[in-house]
């Protein structure tokens, strides 16, 4: 699995290419977390968001499909006492319906062959009145040289995009699925990151 192979260098590589944007996204997501929240994070990767969230919430379950990525999260969040790490598939979440106040999935929808199924699962486990927060890398409406270079580098190392969103098509994705209460925010970077805040 590509993510097992790149887990140890992922933070260093993304910090060089998009560190400022990633930190900004983490700050924005963290502001949505309340002290009483039970949080599920899908596709936690190396724990960039997890590390910001766990001190703020009541509990957090962080999941990923890559064992190596989970090990990176475990190391990064070694002081957490309210964190559980699970290996899990975002399209087949092993949790009861209405289990979490906040469900977060950062930079994964564009990598999935079935993003709709992932949304269905996140919706299922999120409590009524809760929120799904989904930061996702988006390409510019018109590609620039820097973005093309970044995308080519990802292809070289084996990362395959199953869905390629722009900011406008990202909004269309949620509209097509029938979500009405969605707020969007675009964080500039290379690539930029669109954050969808989906009220349940």
Briefly describe each language-model feature range.
Residues 91-103:
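A short acidic, Gly/Pro-enriched loop at the edge of an enzyme's catalytic core
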Residues 116-128:
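A short glycine-rich, Lys/Arg-flanked "PGG" loop and its adjoining helix->strand segment in the class I
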Residues 102-114:
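A short SAM/SAH-binding and catalytic strip from SAM-dependent methyltransferases
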Residues 195-200:
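C-terminal lobe and adjacent flexible extensions of AdoMet/dcAdoMet transferase-like proteins
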Residues 1-34, 48, 72, 76, ...:
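Conserved class I S-adenosyl-L-methionine
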Residues 40-92:
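Class I SAM-dependent methyltransferase SAM/SAH-binding core
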Residues 38, 130-131:
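Short glycine-centered segments of the SAM/dcSAM-binding site in methyltransferase folds
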Residues 13-16, 133-188, 192-193:
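C-terminal alpha-helical "lid/dimerization" subdomain adjacent to the S-adenosyl-L-methionine
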